[in-house]
Regions:
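Conserved N-terminal catalytic core of the sugar/cofactor nucleotidyltransferase
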Residues: 2-5, 13, 31-124, 136
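Residue-level signal for inorganic ion chemistry
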Residues: 34, 111, 127, 166-168, ...
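N-proximal low-complexity "stem/linker" segments adjacent to membrane-targeting elements
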Residues: 1-5, 10-14, 18, 25
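A short, conserved beta-strand element in the Rossmann-like catalytic core
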Residues: 128-131, 240
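Active-site metal-binding loops of divalent metal-dependent hydrolases
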Residues: 10, 127-128
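Conserved donor-nucleotide/metal-binding helix-loop-beta segment in metal-dependent transferases, i.e.
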Residues: 133-161
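Short catalytic helix/loop segments, enriched in acidic residues and glycine
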Residues: 20-35
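Catalytic-core segments of class I nucleotidyltransferases/pyrophosphorylases
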Residues: 138-142, 169-242, 246-258
């Protein structure tokens, strides 16, 4: 299994904080957000390579972070403790601003094509912070061999209005309806920026791009995907943080558990 962390956005909602630093490199509990994500992904035994796709503007900052993170990992290993040994590779999507961005789906497609990925795939958005382990949804994915999108039980219709909410079949976990920031959501289940794809379904990402669909947000892709294939969820109740606003960032700094 390969993993892609999408980190090529420009985070205009967090300006001026993110004017000179990308959102995934903002520190929470002593480490950049992206490092927490990499550590969570590295817990999955089948993941043998992690790609972090970023933009040309912030690529040098990610390079510096990766050099420092590798140095720390070596020091930890020398000290006798265990450290994730999954290789991490940076991918530059060549964009320099919101105006020429490829979009999240476009960035995933770029990595698949450029790196010749032909394996099961895990995608994690680079602004996701969560207290739960991905191992449970990974095990469900292995058993079902279907496209899987982990879900967060927010227990809040207000929170669902601000995100993509999902109605699922309670017995099978299959997606019945997905609503992007609906004014009257039918569910408090929130779609997370995390996706598992079986290898044989990767061609759907290429098909979506080739058909000139909106490459910007995964919500558009998810709605299209539900018309092509079964999509299932795995529900988590442990905390998840959408670090898209200053208030959410402050909450994450208090309540996130590495």
């Amino acid at each position: 299994m390969k993993a892609i962390v999408t980190a090529a956005g420009y985070a205009s909602r967090l300006w001026p904080l993110t004017k000179d630093i990308p959102k995934p490199l903002i520190e929470v509990k002593g480490k950049p957000i992206v490092e927490h994500i990499v550590n969570k992904v590295a817990e999955i035994p089948d993941v043998d390579e992690i790609f972090i796709v970023t933009n040309a503007k912030f690529y040098p900052l990610f390079e510096q972070w990766l050099i420092e993170a590798k140095a720390v990992a070596v020091a930890v290993a020398v000290g006798g403790a265990s450290a994730p040994s999954v290789p991490v590779k940076l991918v530059n999507d060549g964009t320099t601003s919101n105006d020429d961005r490829l979009g999240q789906v476009g960035d995933i497609h770029l990595v698949l094509e450029q790196e010749n990925v032909d394996d099961d795939l895990l995608v994690v958005a680079g602004d996701n912070l969560f207290n739960f382990s991905l191992l449970q949804s990974y095990e469900t994915f292995l058993q079902r061999q279907l496209i899987l999108n982990p879900l967060y039980e927010s227990k809040s219709y207000r929170a669902a209005r601000e995100s993509g909410s999902v109605v699922i079949d309670e017995e099978t976990g299959e997606f019945i309806e997905f609503m992007e920031k609906a004014q009257t959501p039918k569910s408090t289940l929130i779609s997370l920026g995390i996706y598992f794809f079986p290898q044989q379904k990767l061609q759907l990402i290429k098909k979506y791009i080739d058909e000139k669909n909106n490459p910007d947000k995964m919500g558009f892709f998810l709605m299209w995907l539900m018309q092509q294939e079964k999509v299932i969820g795995h529900v988590y109740t442990e905390k998840w943080f959408d670090v898209g606003w200053i208030e959410a960032l402050e909450t994450a700094r208090k309540e996130f558990t590495p």
